[in-house]
Amino acid sequence: MAKKAVASRGARCYAWPPMRKRFFLPAAPRGARAPLRFAADAPWLAPLAGYSDLPFRLLCRHYGAAVCVTEMVSAKGLVHKSPGTGELLLSLPEDQPLVVQLFGAEPEVLGAAVLALRGAGYAWFDCNMGCSVPKVMRQGAGAALLGDTARALACARAMIGAAGGQGRVGFKLRLGLDRDRSILPDLALRLEDAGASWLALHPRTARQGFGGSADWEAIARLAARLSIPLLASGDLLTARDGVRCLAETGASGVMYARGALHDPAVFATHLALLRGKSPPAPDAAALRAMISLHVRLARQYGGDGGALLKMRSLAPRYVRFLPGVRVLRQRLCRCTDWQELEAALDEFLDGAVLS
């Protein structure tokens, strides 16, 4: 896809084209085949529907995310060339390695989607078998696959075969549909036998959604049974949670989701803790730098309209612990352009007092 080069402080960057109403599949950028890392010091950014777009991934990589996963991409949308699907795949060389997460319930469609992505240069794929959103489950996709092991395995084999064998495809799982219908360790072991390269486990059931507590003991039990990497997810709201989860479960690595939404610098804090360093307390200057970077990335790569709406939602999360954030949120909701939004954030941070 053509990109118009523009100057920015002596560096080469790109002005992203406006969003298109027709379907297009962007070619994977240089570095798309960079190897994945599974290690305590290689924290991943989880797939976050509506949030883990290119600007947010670049922000998280700035703070140390080793691998990022796209938002959920509909396999059917790719195969049938639905408008808007391709935008979820926009990337850059510095956004690598990147895992494309697909969702769907038809093995032949998932396989065809992987083939199309491989043809465009993408190298790493993930199948969502954990999304508990009713809209997704009604399609038989996401966590609904946990209730149909035969279909789940057929989908897995189709993706692995289309990807060219072992080493390219992972699967994100939950414990099962509910406590009475656990799929562990049976499905996980069968996915490993089918050629899965890695698994990620959010140790809640589909019925739980995000309620209750994540069962980290289930991660530990599964990690002890697998010979492929296992990424831990669930209740990793801070870097200390992530480091503690690694110690308690023996997982190969961690995947931050809500923790990254609240604080994209969670990756830097995670790495500091592993090195035995005390991370610095948050201050207004650090918050301003993080928010300013996200705004700049969103303006450059986020397309029209939607990027501003998304930033109006995200910015208050970053300063949620400061007094006056409710008023800020209300003010941001009335912002209709980037200048208004930046002025509101600057005014808020100028008066911020961090204890």
Where are these regions (language model features)?
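Extreme N-terminal basic, low-complexity initiation segments
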Residues: 1-9
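Active-site beta-loop-alpha junctions enriched in small/polar residues
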Residues: 48-50, 73-75, 103-105, 130-132, ...
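Glycine-rich, positively charged N-terminal anion/phosphate-binding segment
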Residues: 20-39, 48-123
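Short glycine-enriched, charge-decorated loop/helix-capping segments at active-site entrances
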Residues: 140-146
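Hydrophobic faces of well-ordered beta-strands that scaffold small-molecule active sites
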Residues: 43-47, 68-70, 98-102, 125, ...
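Alpha/beta enzyme core
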Residues: 112-125, 129-139, 150-228
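Short, positively charged and aromatic/hydrophobic N-terminal segments
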Residues: 7, 14-15
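Alpha/beta catalytic cores of nucleotide-metabolism and tRNA/nucleoside-modifying enzymes
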Residues: 3, 16-44, 49, 54-55, ...
